[in-house]
Amino acid sequence: MSESDLWLLPDGVEELLPPEATRIEELRRQLLDLYHSWGYEMIVPPLLEFLDSLLIGVGRDLELEMFKVTDQLTGRLMGIRADMTPQVARIDSRRSHDVASRFCYIGSVLRTKSPSMFSSRTPIQTGCELYGVVGSAADIEIISLMLETLNLAKISPLHMDIAHVGVYQAILAEAKLSKIQSEELFEALRRKAIPEVDEIAATIPDKAIRQKVMALPRLAGGKEKMKEARKIFAGNPDIEYALDEMSQVAAVIGERYPEVEIYFDFCEMRGYKYYTGLVFAAYTEGLGQAVAKGGRYDEVGRDFGRGRPAMGFSVDLKALYRMGKREWAQPAGAILAPNGQDAELWELIRQLRRSNRVIQLMPGEEAGHWASHCDRQIVRDESGQWIVKPLTEFNPNHVK
């Protein structure tokens, strides 16, 4: 391996350097403060667990994205987390009470492949999850908190897609397609490939059901599309219930956040195997994928012995920072301190570090390198006392 190869990082793997790392950390702290103000408790799941635990519920769709290692102590397979939701489900299942549980988390996850060419395989996943609450109130709270997260990062303009897996499930039950046809329809709808959807629909004998299937990729849009959907799907109570949920959530979110454009999408197939109700995703200009997404996944903790209603969202902290339009303030200048073991100098440095950055030179270190980082310096005055002076009066002979 050449020396240059030693410096290379794998594709999709990156490191954070100043000042980006400092700003991302500041954003992380502000997000935790936001979640705390909403009553969400922070949890820190482990980076790796036994594979079986990570593949529970939501995790099974993530198996191909998960790095696997062998535990040298037990010989069992372990996985490095690719998503934190299965871990949160395990944590919630260990709680004995039946009241609502609100969790938030921020931590690195690792994926074998990136969802897109420009996305990271090592995102810093940030999210909130609400357990134990049935109904639209939980959906509205989680979506509101997601939008507050994006607002804090100054991401705009925003538009949000709202979907409901109950619509597709109900139509699939009516159509009575074979397993192969169902899989083909799923893929065609996911890609919004209208000709392929029409071709599959043509095999359905019942005209009314055939028209419902054909309508799915043509119903993406605003309020007018919801009105059209109600006419097309009238008479199916499961679909009508799903449409009511979508409309109720959209109405409240639209009133709270009028600047966010809301669309209904009946072809949103993301997470179809584990989502059980409303699903949503937020988008912004310049990013070809959702900047934040989530949905309802009731009973996700059933395999842990305690299935409960669950709703949540997640976002990549690094994407939040990079897509945001925040104007970051320049850090305050540091104080340059000379090298030395003088007791009075050390006491002054300790006091100053309670509210300032103080950089003390090492033996033989040149002061000039740090001059651009500092706006003040510690020097001795004429009486021999250590004092702080503006760096405009910088004299390298005073700080050695």
Swiss-Prot record:
GO cellular component, as recorded:
cytoplasm
The principal localisation class reads cytoplasm
| Gene3D superfamilies named in the record | Bira Bifunctional Protein, Domain 2
Q: Which UniProt keywords apply?
A: Amino-acid biosynthesis, Cytoplasm, Histidine biosynthesis
Pfam families, sorted: tRNA-synt_His (PF13393)
Per the UniProt entry, what are the Gene Ontology biological process annotations, in alphabetical order?
Answer: histidyl-tRNA aminoacylation; L-histidine biosynthetic process
- GO MF terms, alphabetically ordered: histidine-tRNA ligase activity
Localization in the cell = Cytoplasm
Which pathway?
Answer: Amino-acid biosynthesis; L-histidine biosynthesis; L-histidine from 5-phospho-alpha-D-ribose 1-diphosphate: step 1/9
| Record's subunit section | Heteromultimer composed of HisG and HisZ subunits.
Query: Function of this protein?
Result: Required for the first step of histidine biosynthesis. May allow the feedback regulation of ATP phosphoribosyltransferase activity by histidine.
Relay the record's extra comment.
Answer: This function is generally fulfilled by the C-terminal part of HisG, which is missing in some bacteria such as this one.
What family does the database annotate? Belongs to the class-II aminoacyl-tRNA synthetase family. HisZ subfamily.
Q: What is this protein called?
A: ATP phosphoribosyltransferase regulatory subunit
Q: Which organism is it from?
A: Hahella chejuensis (strain KCTC 2396)
The primary gene name is hisZ
